[in-house]
């Protein structure tokens, strides 16, 4: 259940989530209809075993999950059938259908195929820190994160969440760290980075499994390249890649964090899940607060 990526948003800590359990059922995921392309809504964080539980809260952490069902209609299949239909009409009527007629034919084909299309299920998990006013979405896609915000907005009626905004350029901070400026306490460099020439269409350099402080990196910095992605390690607990878009990718929970689970005395699957949720939420909070200070992240009003 550990998150692998984090797209973060901020929201005012004054928001009231006390009625969340009564607000979610009306916006629960419904099966995609025969003539629908997709469906979105909330599902249980615990999966099929507890379908009626649409949220999970431990102290100031709230776990929500947005589920999706999407019809799979490969474009190649639709286009192949469309060309066959167009050929039939051309042979029968002696003329090739124009643009508008082709569009109507394509719409009719999709309408005909939808009830028989396969359905792909998906889920996107999110943790809301009600004390510090941020939401961490388990995705590296901004669009996926915005979709989760939209679903929460639909449930609450209003949810003024905004993407993270840094008061200083993240690229400048990341470049400074790799150039030798002191990192925040507990943070150290990993072995991966991406550097770009700031001019449009400039060169891009990607380094992996490499010492990030050395002559080779220095030459790129001297040439004016700036760091756009940087691998970092937080104590012995987390490793991740931070981008200048403020998205956290390749998040991994290390032994320093996982060892805490081995000392848990709780038994049972639900107790183990709660222990993992508590650990993950606390580590993400620690990381967020560190980055909030280092990058001067704006608060939500």
Curated annotation (Swiss-Prot):
<dbReference type="GO" id="GO:0043590">
    <property type="term" value="C:bacterial nucleoid"/>
</dbReference>
<protein>
    <recommendedName>
        <fullName>Recombination-associated protein RdgC</fullName>
    </recommendedName>
</protein>
<dbReference type="InterPro" id="IPR007476">
    <property type="entry name" value="RdgC"/>
</dbReference>
<dbReference type="GO" id="GO:0003690">
    <property type="term" value="F:double-stranded DNA binding"/>
</dbReference>
<comment type="similarity">
    <text>Belongs to the RdgC family.</text>
</comment>
<dbReference type="GO" id="GO:0005737">
    <property type="term" value="C:cytoplasm"/>
</dbReference>
<comment type="function">
    <text>May be involved in recombination.</text>
</comment>
<keyword id="KW-0963">Cytoplasm</keyword>
<dbReference type="GO" id="GO:0006310">
    <property type="term" value="P:DNA recombination"/>
</dbReference>
<dbReference type="Pfam" id="PF04381">
    <property type="entry name" value="RdgC"/>
</dbReference>
<dbReference type="GO" id="GO:0000018">
    <property type="term" value="P:regulation of DNA recombination"/>
</dbReference>
<keyword id="KW-0233">DNA recombination</keyword>
């Amino acid at each position: 259940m550990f998150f692998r990526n984090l797209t973060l948003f901020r929201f005012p800590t004054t928001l009231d989530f006390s009625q969340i359990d009564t607000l979610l059922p009306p916006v629960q995921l419904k099966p995609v209809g025969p003539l629908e392309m997709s469906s979105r809504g909330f599902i249980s964080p615990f999966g099929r075993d507890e379908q009626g539980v649409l949220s999970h809260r431990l102290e100031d952490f709230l776990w929500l999950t947005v589920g999706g069902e999407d019809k799979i209609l490969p474009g190649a299949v639709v286009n192949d059938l469309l060309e066959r239909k167009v050929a039939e009409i051309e042979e029968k009527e002696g003329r090739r259908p124009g643009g508008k007629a082709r569009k109507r034919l394509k719409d009719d084909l999709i309408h005909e195929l939808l009830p028989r299309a396969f359905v792909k299920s998906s889920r996107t998990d999110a943790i809301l820190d009600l004390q510090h006013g941020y939401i961490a979405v388990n995705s590296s896609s901004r669009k996926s994160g915005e979709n989760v915000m939209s679903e929460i907005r639909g449930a609450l009626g209003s949810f003024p969440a905004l993407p993270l905004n840094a008061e200083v350029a993240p690229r400048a901070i990341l470049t400074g760290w790799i150039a030798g400026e002191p990192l925040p306490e507990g943070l150290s460099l990993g072995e991966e980075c991406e550097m770009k020439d700031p001019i449009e269409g400039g060169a891009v350099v990607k380094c992996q499994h490499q010492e990030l402080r050395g002559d080779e990196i220095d030459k790129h910095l001297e040439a004016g390249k700036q760091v756009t992605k940087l691998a970092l390690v937080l104590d012995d607990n987390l490793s991740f890649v931070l981008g200048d878009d403020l998205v956290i990718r390749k998040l991994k929970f290390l032994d320093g964090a996982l060892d805490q689970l081995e000392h848990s005395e709780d038994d049972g699957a639900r107790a183990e899940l709660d222990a993992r949720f508590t650990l993950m939420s606390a580590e993400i909070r620690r990381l967020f607060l560190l980055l909030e200070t280092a990058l001067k992240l704006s608060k939500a009003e």
